[in-house]
Amino acid sequence: MNYNNKILVSESGLSQKHLIHGDEELFQHELKTIFARNWLFLTHDSLIPAPGDYVTAKMGIDEVIVSRQNDGSIRAFLNVCRHRGKTLVSVEAGNAKGFVCSYHGWGFGSNGELQSVPFEKDLYGESLNKKCLGLKEVARVESFHGFIYGCFDQEAPPLMDYLGDAAWYLEPMFKHSGGLELVGPPGKVVIKANWKAPAENFVGDAYHVGWTHASSLRSGESIFSSLAGNAALPPEGAGLQMTSKYGSGMGVLWDGYSGVHSADLVPELMAFGGAKQERLNKEIGDVRARIYRSHLNCTVFPNNSMLTCSGVFKVWNPIDANTTEVWTYAIVEKDMPEDLKRRLADSVQRTFGPAGFWESDDNDNMETASQNGKKYQSRDSDLLSNLGFGEDVYGDAVYPGVVGKSAIGETSYRGFYRAYQAHVSSSNWAEFEHASSTWHTELTKTTDR
């Protein structure tokens, strides 16, 4: 199929063909145009603090080794031996000066260089050029306040530019709070859903919370419990949504610092966050200080999502068009007491981990929506994301990005899928940029409802 001319997402991101969640040929195309081109989350500084520390991570369907170098920098390499293609490292994390393949014993340094070959002189003589046989390196590795992302494409914009307007909303928690830590290793589970189904859910779907999560809201007694069973809408002014040029976006629920954590944690969390308010008001202003203590449900395009004040951090690793491996970490503020960090991490796994009750609520929705995307009659139907269209603004005096000033809407859906369509119909970054030259105008139209 020629995706340069295939319209999978309508103008302004108002709808998507259902087949985007179930078509295997399209999935293979995504590996080239989405996962080989965009910035993908790898790890966090706190998980590889010392030289020689490494973790394995996924970039699309490929696995990489992410290693702290002797000079403190971080590099990433395909986890594939250059001799006969065997997986080089079979564990999730460790510390090593190098990596030795268990097939024929070829040894690579933590810098990716081929350092040793058994019986090299006897078997190869002078014919083996080890300098050309190092591990394939991920072209770009950059950090957003300790969160490490990698990109295979040299032409990609710098990570900070790629995050764009979304960074303004993330930095109060990621930077100005004093910094974050990632608690690993991640909980892992495989779901029978396309990777985009959970990514779109986290990018800004507050609409489903009261209904899908009714029992979880009631049993957890979180600050959002009043929404259970669609008993009420969030009041006017309770939040907003935003999206950005490269597809990253989020919803903001004001003053939701204790997130989905149960009632026993709420007083301690609210006191901890509240203690930083005076300093943050002075450093970054009242609005961004309020964003720090507000609940953000966010997706960094394409497949990294988070619920900031709930401490949930996700990577949706694709396996095929209808299968995704979900990695769930906890994020905690660096200066939290160690006991509070531990209890928050436990709460994350209890709510959104592999067996979490909030997670279980979502999975059936995501799985059946994805599986229906490959069925004959439903695959060409349109999935709607038009809620709030015509009310979004760009160039607001306070809030950057394309903004929908309501807690419930689909602003960030439209931005996510506008970027998605631009990528799958482009051959490179230059073509994507051309297709995105009027991105905010397209998303803020007031016609074509």
From Swiss-Prot:
Effect recorded for residue 352 to V: Cis-dihydroxylation of naphthalene results in the formation of cis-naphthalene dihydrodiol with altered stereochemistry
Protein name: Naphthalene 1,2-dioxygenase system, large oxygenase component
Database matches in SUPFAM superfamilies: Bet v1-like, ISP domain
Effect of residue 358 to A: Unable to catalyze the cis-dihydroxylation of biphenyl
Cofactor field: [2Fe-2S] cluster; Fe(2+)
Cofactor note: Binds 1 [2Fe-2S] cluster.
EC class name: oxidoreductase
InterPro entries: RHO_NdoB-like_C (IPR043266), Rieske_2Fe-2S (IPR017941), Rieske_2Fe-2S_sf (IPR036922), Ring-hydroxy_dOase_2Fe2S_BS (IPR015881), Ring_hydroxy_dOase_asu_C_dom (IPR015879), Rng_hydr_dOase-A (IPR001663)
Effect of residue 275 to S: In strain: G7
Catalytic activity: naphthalene + NADH + O2 + H(+) = (1R,2S)-1,2-dihydronaphthalene-1,2-diol + NAD(+)
Pathway named in the protein's UniProt entry: Aromatic compound metabolism; naphthalene degradation
Subunit structure: The naphthalene dioxygenase (NDO) multicomponent enzyme system is composed of an electron transfer component and a dioxygenase component (iron sulfur protein (ISP)). The electron transfer component is composed of a ferredoxin reductase (NdoR) and a ferredoxin (NdoA), and the dioxygenase component is formed of a heterohexamer (trimer of heterodimers) of three large alpha subunits (NdoB) and three small beta subunits (NdoC).
One GO BP annotation of this record: catabolic process
Effect of residue 12 to F: In strain: ATCC 17484
Residue pairs linked by disulfide bridges in the UniProt entry: none
Record site feature (Important for enantioselectivity), residues: 352
Pfam families associated with the record: Rieske, Ring_hydroxyl_A
Gene symbol of the encoding locus: ndoB
UniProt-listed Enzyme Commission number(s): 1.14.12.12
Keyword Oxidoreductase: yes
Impact after mutating residue 122 to E: In strain: G7
Record bears the keyword NAD: yes
Protein residues bound to Fe cation: 208, 213, 362
Outcome reported for the amino acid change (mutating residue 362 to A): Unable to catalyze the cis-dihydroxylation of naphthalene, biphenyl and phenanthrene
Domain of life: Bacteria
Entry function: Component of the naphthalene dioxygenase (NDO) multicomponent enzyme system which catalyzes the incorporation of both atoms of molecular oxygen into naphthalene to form cis-(1R,2S)-dihydroxy-1,2-dihydronaphthalene. The alpha subunit has a catalytic role in the holoenzyme. Also able to catalyze the cis-dihydroxylation of biphenyl and phenanthrene.
Effect recorded for residue 434 to D: In strain: G7
